[in-house]
């Protein structure tokens, strides 16, 4: 779903070094090539640059689009999102081929790709916008998410705080924030400081 505004956030150089705070945008998520076959799940696991860099590498994933979901204000401005008044969460909308990678497999990567027990956000990115969420696109997917969460809990000493909700309207991030890590890892120190170690730990390309 397209956002109906075009807001530019001015980021200071120091903010780029330590946090993930981009802009809201008019970019529609990549359309599945076969809507009858492909499925969609929307995941929030901290800064969407990080989550996107993980899922776009997985075999069977058709597209991974950064954006926002879960708020109570339609067509939110950047100020409303990042002041945490709109209720939106940074997410990555993942379109995948279930014949190549299943929903439970997608979710296993999700649990490994972030710390779902952190109630304050992820790493240096703190606040409700960076908290752990799964937005299910069907009742079956929500059931699978609940089961996966219970299974994942056995790997953590503290409670998983991930919220599981039905998918809502998706607002894609600006084009400049899509495929961010692999385009900007040599320019923005946030990438080698925060994203590269995660990709190395997961055995993915970096």
Regions found by a protein language model. Name each.
Residues 1-27:
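Bacterial Sec-dependent N-terminal signal peptides
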Residues 20-206:
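Flexible coil/turn and secondary-structure edge motifs
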């Amino acid at each position: 779903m397209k956002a109906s505004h075009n807001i530019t956030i001015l980021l200071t150089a120091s903010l780029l070094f330590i946090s993930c705070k981009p802009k809201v945008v008019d970019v529609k998520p990549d359309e599945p090539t076969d809507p009858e076959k492909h499925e969609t799940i929307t995941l929030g696991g901290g800064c969407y640059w990080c989550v996107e860099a993980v899922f776009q590498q997985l075999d069977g994933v058709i597209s991974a689009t950064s954006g926002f979901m879960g708020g109570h204000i339609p067509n939110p401005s950047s100020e409303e999102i990042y002041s945490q008044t709109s209720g939106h969460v940074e997410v990555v909308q993942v379109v995948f081929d279930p014949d190549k990678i299943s929903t439970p497999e997608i979710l296993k990567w999700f649990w490994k790709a972030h710390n779902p027990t952190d109630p304050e956000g992820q790493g240096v990115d703190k606040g409700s916008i960076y908290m752990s969420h799964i937005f299910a696109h069907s009742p079956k997917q929500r059931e699978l998410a609940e089961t996966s969460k219970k299974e994942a809990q056995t790997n953590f000493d503290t409670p998983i705080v991930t919220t599981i909700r039905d998918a809502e309207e998706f607002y894609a991030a600006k084009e400049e924030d899509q495929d961010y890590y692999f385009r900007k890892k040599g320019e923005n120190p946030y990438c080698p400081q925060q994203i590269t170690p995660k990709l190395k730990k997961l055995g993915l390309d970096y």
